[in-house]
């Protein structure tokens, strides 16, 4: 009986790790350009999920403590035309689409690594309804 309980606990721990890992997910983002004065919502894919991480009590200066986050490993770019743009302005908007995810260091050159970013649905202008 004890072996069965241990097996069940092991299974549930494995399931918790495997089923909530870093993976592609569908999201909706708001895109805008100042010349267009409108936001539109676009469906795309991005990375979401959990990565094993820890915060050490003793900070060893010789060994950096890098927290891993769920981020893209591969991405492509897609382009849409924004409606309502001024004449002679560039109405094209290019946005990233994740095609593969992994647990790795957050690259602040290409990603908002802050805890409280604006979020994917932030919009400065009114949203254009379809």
From Swiss-Prot:
Its main location: secreted. The keyword Signal applies. GO terms for cellular component: cytoplasm; extracellular space; follicle-stimulating hormone complex. Transmembrane segments: none annotated. GO terms for molecular function: follicle-stimulating hormone activity. SUPFAM superfamilies: Cystine-knot cytokines (SSF57501). Glycans are attached at residues 26, 43. Residues 1-20 form the signal peptide. SMART domains: GHB. The keyword Signal applies. GO terms for biological process: follicle-stimulating hormone signaling pathway; G protein-coupled receptor signaling pathway; ovarian follicle development; positive regulation of bone resorption; positive regulation of gene expression; positive regulation of steroid biosynthetic process; regulation of osteoclast differentiation; regulation of signaling receptor activity. It is found in: Secreted. Keywords: Disulfide bond, Glycoprotein, Hormone, Secreted, Signal. InterPro entries: Cystine-knot_cytokine (IPR029034), Glyco_hormone_CN (IPR006208), Gonadotropin_bsu (IPR001545), Gonadotropin_bsu_CS (IPR018245). Disruption phenotype: Mice lacking Fshb are viable. Females are infertile displaying abnormal uterus and ovaries that lacked corpora lutea. The infertility is due to impaired follicle maturation which appears before antral follicle formation. Males are fertile and spermatogenesis proceeds normally. However, these mice display a reduced testes size and epididymal sperm count. The number of Sertoli cells is significantly reduced and their ability to support germ cell development is also affected. Disulfide bonds join 22-70, 36-85, 39-123, 47-101, 51-103, 106-113. Belongs to the glycoprotein hormones subunit beta family. Together with the alpha chain CGA constitutes follitropin, the follicle-stimulating hormone, and provides its biological specificity to the hormone heterodimer. Binds FSHR, a G protein-coupled receptor, on target cells to activate downstream signaling pathways. Follitropin is involved in follicle development and spermatogenesis in reproductive organs. Heterodimer. The active follitropin is a heterodimer composed of an alpha chain/CGA shared with other hormones and a unique beta chain/FSHB shown here. This is Follitropin subunit beta.
